[in-house]
């Protein structure tokens, strides 16, 4: 995760430049974010209004409120752990989780992230997020499969001596 490291397309303050092999899944406007580092750091960042973008590689938040402590936030999808949907009795629904730091990202230690969807859209976000996590898990499980030696190639018997017993009878019956 990193603070103020998002690269924008030229002439735009909200259109992010996608990484290689990255595609945009969805964007959600009117999202508030709070990032609270766990002890011993206790640093925190908050913003009451911004744009949240979900790609196949990362979660990107762009602050739209000028009073925010930061301009943008991004985290690789694989660095978000223990995520969950929270539905309080009073207040807007929010999504929370633990974010692991990246080297030189501006955030010193793992942090608790809270995304509050003030203008709706949380269920669309959760659906897209769950599909993305499922893809990550499928790729991870495929990479862990033990690859055995390949089967030898099949060669059709060239003579009747190479054929199994009663082969001719079985072929002629059909």
Curated annotation (Swiss-Prot):
Induction: By stress. InterPro entries: WBP2-like. GO terms for molecular function: chromatin DNA binding; transcription coactivator activity. Keywords: Cytoplasm, Nucleus. Its main location: cytoplasm. Residues 165-174 have a biased composition (Basic and acidic residues). Residues 147-174 are annotated as: Disordered. SUPFAM superfamilies: PH domain-like (SSF50729). The keyword Transport does not apply. CDD domains: PH-GRAM_WBP2. One of its GO terms (biological process) is positive regulation of transcription by RNA polymerase II. The keyword Cytoplasm applies. GO terms for cellular component: cytosol; nucleus. It is found in: Cytoplasm; Nucleus. Belongs to the UPF0664 family. This is UPF0664 stress-induced protein C29B12.11c.
């Amino acid at each position: 995760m990193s603070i103020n490291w998002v690269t924008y397309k030229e002439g735009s303050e909200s259109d992010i430049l996608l990484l290689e092999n990255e595609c945009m899944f969805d964007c959600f406007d009117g999202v508030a974010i709070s990032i609270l580092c766990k002890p011993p750091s206790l640093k925190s960042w908050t913003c009451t209004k911004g744009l949240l973008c979900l790609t196949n590689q990362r979660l990107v938040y762009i602050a739209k409120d000028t009073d925010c402590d930061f301009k943008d936030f991004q985290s690789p999808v694989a660095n978000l752990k223990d995520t969950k949907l929270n539905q309080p009795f009073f207040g807007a629904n929010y999504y929370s989780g633990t974010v692991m730091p990246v080297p030189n990202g501006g955030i010193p230690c793992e942090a608790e992230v809270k995304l509050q969807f003030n203008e709706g859209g949380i269920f669309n976000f959760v659906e897209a997020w769950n599909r993305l996590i499922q893809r990550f898990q499928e790729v991870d499980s495929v990479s862990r499969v033990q690859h055995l030696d390949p089967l030898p190639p099949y060669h059709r018997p060239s003579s009747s001596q190479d054929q199994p017993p009663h082969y001719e009878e079985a072929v002629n019956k059909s």
